[in-house]
Amino acid sequence: MAIKITPDEFSLLIQRLNKKWRVFAPSAEFRGGRFSDTDNIIYQRISGWRDLIWHEKSHMSPNTIIAPITETLFYFDKDTIQIAETDTSPIIIFARACDINAMSRLDYMYLSNGNNSDYSYQLLREHIRFVLIECEESFENCFCVSMGTNKTDCYSAAMRFSDEGALVSIRDPFIEAAIQGLGQEADYTPSFVSENRETVVTPDSVCHDPQKIRDILTHHPLWDAYDSRCISCGRCTTGCPTCTCYSVFDVAYDENPQRGERRRQWASCMVPGFSDMAGGHGFREKPGERLRYRALHKVNDYKARNGIEHMCVGCGRCDDRCPQYIKFSLIINKMTAAVRQALAEEA
């Protein structure tokens, strides 16, 4: 079923959905951007057409909804623990194909990577549905086609936006019920980006042994250049839809130090101190070493463990956000070239 709705009808649809669902979509945080006169496009709850930013790539990904930047896990009072309440009311997220594909990576990390699933993540994940925002063309720095994340069928509805409104392809009954009486029938089948200006070739395309790739790249000189270029700000990780690193710490209340709460907060493998250990020991002290660790995880180590897909989805946000204009897509191609050269020299 497909229909065409106007901006006013879209707003009415969101109002209907908001009665039961929490609806999140890319929206502008006024003057919250990198410069004083720019907005920050982040995921927020929306109430209508005017709140939605559909013509630009969001600066932050929807993982801020399902894995909040900071959250309380539980409260403690001497010998007792109380699990923090989680709002489990259902959620609808308007997202692009790359970000919907990123959810399978988060699901693996939080639900399958180890013997226990993450309690807080699982509570939210069970109640989330997606509405696909169709990309009519590739944005700057995207390389989703190379990563195989330009397409998805994991959505309840798909929408193609324009200034005149939206074409809607409906797959799930709850969307069909909410949109009842709105719009006009239309001929619409979602389409997906088939090419990007940026293209990458991952190391596993030239070598099928992830340990061999790791051995070749761990001490390769290509990382040395980033010791001076990378400033270790962590912006690439905060914008990434598949990063899952966090720190856990306790907050004791001033009134009674035996009472408090345990929180977890986003962390970054690109920031100094992330790998520090007791006794003053640390790993990856140089920026280039930290970048190597992140790059190998995104396009080698994760797939070696998962066995299905790379962690990187090619959204290009790391390239968009880097103040030093370091291109992750170029790094991937450099990694592949280094592996290809090493294999040729061994032959």
Swiss-Prot record:
Q: Does the keyword Repeat apply?
A: yes
Which compartments does it reside in? Answer: Cytoplasm
Q: Which residues bind [4Fe-4S] cluster 1?
A: C230, C233, C236, C240
Quote the record's binding site residues for [4Fe-4S] cluster 2.
C312, C315, C318, C322
A GO term, aspect molecular function: metal ion binding
How is the cofactor bound, in the record's words?
Answer: Binds 2 [4Fe-4S] clusters.
Induction annotation: By sulfite. Repressed by oxygen.
**Tree of life domain:** Bacteria
Which pathway does it take part in?
Answer: Sulfur metabolism; sulfite reduction
Q: Which residues form the 4Fe-4S ferredoxin-type domain?
A: 219-251, 302-331
Q: Which cofactor does it need?
A: [4Fe-4S] cluster
**Alphabetic keyword roster:** 4Fe-4S, Cytoplasm, Electron transport, Iron, Iron-sulfur, Metal-binding, Repeat, Transport
Which GO CC terms are listed, alphabetically? Answer: cytoplasm
Q: Does the keyword Transport apply?
A: yes
SUPFAM superfamilies in the record, alphabetically? alpha-helical ferredoxin
Q: What does this protein do?
A: Electron transfer protein for anaerobic sulfite reductase subunit A.
Subunit structure, per the record? Answer: The anaerobic sulfite reductase seems to consist of three subunits.
Protein name stated in the entry = Anaerobic sulfite reductase subunit A
The species this protein was found in: Salmonella typhimurium (strain LT2 / SGSC1412 / ATCC 700720)
